[in-house]
Amino acid sequence: ADVLLVGDERVYEFITHLLAEIRRTFRSRKIHIGMDEAFGLGRGAYLDLHGYHPQLEIMKQHLERVLSICKTLEIEPMVWSDMLINASHGKGTGMANYYNTDHPILPEAHDAFPRDLTQVFWDYNHHEASTYEAIIARHKIFTDRVVFAGACWNWNSFTTDYDKTFLITKPALQACKRSGVRDVFMTTWGDNGVEGSLLETLLGAQLFAEYGYADEVDDARLRARFLTCTGCNYDDFRAMTY
């Protein structure tokens, strides 16, 4: 079981305690509340208890409760957007549907989620800026607050895959600039056999940082800035690609 039971009061008691502890621990009021890849939403025990309900309806119900808790605790939430986008067209969950901008939006989905909710568009795979721009445009149907999450590919390998990282990051951040997305962050992940150190991803962080100051970032600029900021050698990190 990897999906919380929507509607069960024990779930919201747990979430309240969880968020309250985070609120006490950190100074920031911005908290990422996740909700991604909940492919089993509305199935399993929920289906046994309540019968079939569309995922859009269930997601809306759950999100309203969690946002109410966040408001009480004076937390500013952001949420992964994949389940919201997938629920909005009703074509099914999964990454292929998340990134498919040809699916028509259900009429009832246009106002299903608060427009002031920050939705985090995550994409670690596409190579064309136009693809990112199209998906960002779809997000803006639902919210004025879009954040982009890219990645430094430190998983699925013995070391960080900088060839892939550079291939996806440059078009993604260029698309964000053209689309007016001002907030971005770089993810790293520990699943699927990651064996390297997080320190290996420093060059990826430098790449993201430099796009905050320039429309184009070439290797010469990145090499110089990386040495200045970290004391590390650009070529050594690029050579780690496996």
Where are these regions (language model features)?
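Catalytic core of soluble alpha/beta enzymes
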Residues: 1-6, 39
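Substrate-binding groove of N-acetylhexosamine-processing glycoside hydrolases
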Residues: 9-24, 28-31, 37, 48-242
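Short acidic/His/Gly/Ser-rich catalytic and metal-binding motifs that mark active-site loops
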Residues: 39-45
